[in-house]
Amino acid sequence: FVVGLEIKREVVRGALSNRKTASLPVIAAFGGMVVPAMIYASINWDNDIALRGWAIPAATDIAFAVGVLALLGSRVPPALKVFLLALAIIDDLGAILIIAFFYSSGLSVSALALAAAGIALLALLNRSNVLRVWPYLLVGAIVWLCVLKSGVHATLAGVATALAVPLTGVKKGQEGPLESLENRLSPWVSFVILPIFAFANAGVSLTGLSAAQVVSPIPLGIALGLFIGKPLGIYTCARVAISSGIGAMPAGASQVQLFGTAILGGIGFTMSLFIGMLAFHGPLESAEVRVGVLAGSLMSAVVGYLVLARHRTV
């Protein structure tokens, strides 16, 4: 839901409101999802069960990636921070769509029809300029329940509800319903919900895991997908977009800083763990997922920080 609020704000007023500025993170995010998935799939190609985890290294954790970049303060240009935020938001939307379409089963047409009717009602509320938040939350809760019962992952309902919430307030310059909700919910999500989820899922027990299993195809594919695939996909696609004139280089940023930011895109953590939880249910595979996610995310955070810390803004 909060990701949906962030997406709408950025599209209407933020970094994604300008076509050329928006093109760069969109194209970079695409590369940052495709290349890690390809690396994971190439390593696990001969194992149908392991292939279920192809989307695990395709995710970026907004809070952790932006948090590491924030530690650098004025050593990185503001435009680069906006680029990473937009990239992570688009990446999260891609992850949500992947979850909805590839990790859902047993679709119920009647439940989907009711969810579609609820989404239409949300659109009607928006078109009618209803500025109170509770009607959106009430209808959104019903849509969430219908989507959950339909067999499609319910994260999609949160995004749909958020996109319907009005951005502007009653008076010009007044905080609108969307920004009010985002300001209230973001601290809870960033400092309570995400840390609880991370701590609950990040505990890696190596009991029963041999040294060979720690570097087996599943954790190896995830770690390499995050640490190698993410920066390779993000930076390469960003360079193509800039060279072709489709996208614009973040103001004040150097090529090295762009690459360092691409490395930070490999911090998958919470979203990668979440996809891993949906892909695998066995204790052995779950432990391997955690090893791969933590290894890839930690290497991305440390190396990305060091690359950016050693280079100043141009």
Regions found by a protein language model. Name each.
Residues 98, 126-128, 132-142, 146-149, ...:
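Predominantly late transmembrane helices and immediately cytosolic-facing juxtamembrane segments
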Residues 2-18, 36-55:
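Transmembrane alpha-helix boundary signature
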Residues 69, 73-166:
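Functional cores that coordinate and move charged inorganic groups
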Residues 18-27, 47-59, 76-86, 215-224, ...:
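The feature identifies polytopic integral membrane transport proteins across all domains of life
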Residues 42-54, 97-106, 271-291:
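Interfacial helix-loop-helix junctions of multi-pass membrane proteins
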Residues 48-63, 86, 104-117, 153-160, ...:
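Structural signature of hydrophobic alpha-helical transmembrane segments
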Residues 2, 6, 35-36, 57-83, ...:
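Short helical (or helix-break) motifs at transmembrane helix termini and adjacent helical loops
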